[in-house]
């Protein structure tokens, strides 16, 4: 099942559920106020399944504007998620190379703050790049959706923009290299009720 946020022809922000590749059901017509409230439900997968069975208004995707599914949440990211990334970062920075020695071995996860919701862009919107960087790169990510009870409730996709030359100059510059206006894109869909193999 795939959830989304969208604007309808009247510019109202609504919550939708994919019916097929070109149609969504309007969950807001059933009283769903937000994706967050839906995913905070301890039995969210069953609730969404029940909603899918209802006779709700349907809209063509071509008639709506898909939005990022991030409503009011922070976005956090896991750093250096594959071995090639670790090696590249060690090669790019004499100053910071030793900082990556403990990646995958440290007791604490390599997680860092990425974005506030107002800096996240949605589907079809341009991501930002830093003007003072000569090497801005997109980093496509599998994105986990976790509710306030720390339950994994869904998956989406993200794009973590990075200014690699700034990061490579000094590891302490990581926030400047990662957190800036439009440095994060998320969505449009949140896949719920799927196991890891299906994602």
Regions found by a protein language model. Give the residues of each.
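Gly/serine-rich nucleotide phosphate-binding loop at the start of the catalytic core
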Residues: 2-44
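Active-site microenvironments in enzyme catalytic cores
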Residues: 4, 46-199
């Amino acid at each position: 099942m795939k959830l989304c946020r969208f604007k309808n022809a009247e510019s109202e922000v609504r919550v939708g559920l994919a019916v097929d590749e070109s149609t969504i059901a309007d969950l807001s017509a059933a009283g769903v106020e937000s994706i967050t409230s839906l995913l905070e439900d301890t039995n969210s997968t069953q609730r969404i399944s029940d909603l899918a069975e209802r006779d709700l208004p349907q809209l063509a995707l071509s008639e709506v504007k898909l939005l990022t599914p991030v409503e009011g949440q922070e976005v956090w990211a896991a750093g250096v998620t594959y071995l090639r990334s670790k090696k590249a970062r060690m090669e790019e920075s004499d100053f910071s190379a030793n900082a990556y020695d403990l990646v995958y071995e440290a007791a604490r996860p390599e997680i860092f703050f990425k974005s506030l919701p107002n800096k996240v862009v949605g589907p079809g919107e341009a991501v930002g790049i830093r003007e003072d960087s000569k090497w801005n790169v997109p980093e496509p990510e599998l994105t986990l959706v976790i509710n306030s009870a720390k339950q994994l409730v869904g998956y989406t996709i993200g794009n973590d923009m990075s200014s690699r030359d700034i990061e490579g100059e000094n590891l302490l510059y990581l926030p400047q290299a990662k957190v800036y206006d439009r440095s994060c894109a998320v969505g449009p869909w949140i896949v719920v009720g799927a196991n890891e193999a299906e994602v």
